[in-house]
Amino acid sequence: METFLFTSESVNEGHPDKLCDQISDAVLDACLAQDPESKVACETCTKTNMVMVFGEITTKAQVDYEKIVRDTCRAIGFVSDDVGLDADNCKVLVNIEQQSPDIAQGVHGHLTKRPEEIGAGDQGHMFGYATDETPELMPLSHVLATKLGARLTEVRKNGTCPWLRPDGKTQVTVEYYNDNGAMVPIRVHTVLISTQHDETVTNDEIAADLKEHVIKPVVPEKYLDEKTIFHLNPSGRFVIGGPHGDAGLTGRKIIIDTYGGWGAHGGGAFSGKDPTKVDRSGAYIVRQAAKSIVASGLARRCIVQVSYAIGVPEPLSVFVDTYGTGKIPDKEILKIVKENFDFRPGMIAINLDLKRGGNSRFLKTAAYGHFGREDPDFTWEVVKPLKFEKVEA
């Protein structure tokens, strides 16, 4: 049996880039909670002792940007300079302007257009992917890397591993078998965890705790064997982290946010963007399409692409590839996708309820992945029953 190795990585919520994603989405939540028609394009950057939010926001909402920044940093665990940032004493810079009137008239006619007439907020192409290798219909390498990162945060916050600090990265290599286009995981080849820690702990303690409290509860035993390689804090020291260790920027972790290197990516980031931005809404609807195709049994693995022009509601193109795993030809599946999914941005926002913010709805997406999550707020993860005429075999 011929196998191959494939690797996916993740970072947890204390990574500086992910901190920025979460602040941008916390701002989006705050705007949408008060004004569902808010137009938000919010970027965040951070470095030692400083966070800046900037971008274009048009909203009726009254938003205290500085409070959102400090609250988000504090919730993640950035409460002192020692851990990489002090939420209550860092500098917060805000430079936010209104959306360009040129963009506004072209996209939503200064809020006069009906939902089905709303144009895409920009050009671009987005991909959705699904695979039957996990219950989430997501790639195993990505699922494990993501869950290890989430588990690191859990054991830090609940006191199981008090030596942990907020910043950390994970990476998982899985050995796969290609079953006529479908991906079948055989075993976990390598697990890599690099996590920020305090001065009190030894490398041996770090390795023992990570194996016992992080890896064991997350990686199913059937995938581990005596040959599995573990790299646990291989650099030997990771005390300085968060924005003190590296600068952070919104939209720098787009592969972690999606499919861990599987499928494809059009390059657009998600966080800090309202649903007229097709980078986000387009990627969400094609995930629902790909997932629904696989869940319905039409294919074991599927990718869907959609593309847009600024100001134009209808997509320019829709593409489907099932990697040879389709029960019917791809062109038939493409027809089913087009008949069952409305790719116009205004209709995506309605069908996936994307104008509803608040309650950390989008903040939750900004760490540990936008896809494969069981949470009613992740409306794009709901499998849509597909209507089509059954072709008799």
Swiss-Prot record:
HAMAP family: S_AdoMet_synth1 (MF_00086). Its cofactor is Mn(2+); Mg(2+); Co(2+); K(+). Induction: Transiently induced by elicitors from Phytophthora megasperma, salt stress, and sucrose. Catalyzes the formation of S-adenosylmethionine from methionine and ATP. The reaction comprises two steps that are both catalyzed by the same enzyme: formation of S-adenosylmethionine (AdoMet) and triphosphate, and subsequent hydrolysis of the triphosphate. Optimum pH is 7-8.3. The gene is SAMS2. GO terms for cellular component: cytoplasm. It catalyses: L-methionine + ATP + H2O = S-adenosyl-L-methionine + phosphate + diphosphate. Belongs to the AdoMet synthase family. L-methionine binds at residues 56, 99, 246, 277. InterPro entries: ADOMET_SYNTHASE_CS, S-AdoMet_synt_C, S-AdoMet_synt_central, S-AdoMet_synt_N, S-AdoMet_synthetase, S-AdoMet_synthetase_sfam. It is found in: Cytoplasm. This is S-adenosylmethionine synthase 2. Keywords: ATP-binding, Cobalt, Cytoplasm, Magnesium, Manganese, Metal-binding, Nucleotide-binding, One-carbon metabolism, Potassium, Transferase. Optimum temperature is 37-45 degrees Celsius. It holds the Pfam family S-AdoMet_synt_N. Pathway: Amino-acid biosynthesis; S-adenosyl-L-methionine biosynthesis; S-adenosyl-L-methionine from L-methionine: step 1/1. One of its GO terms (biological process) is one-carbon metabolic process.
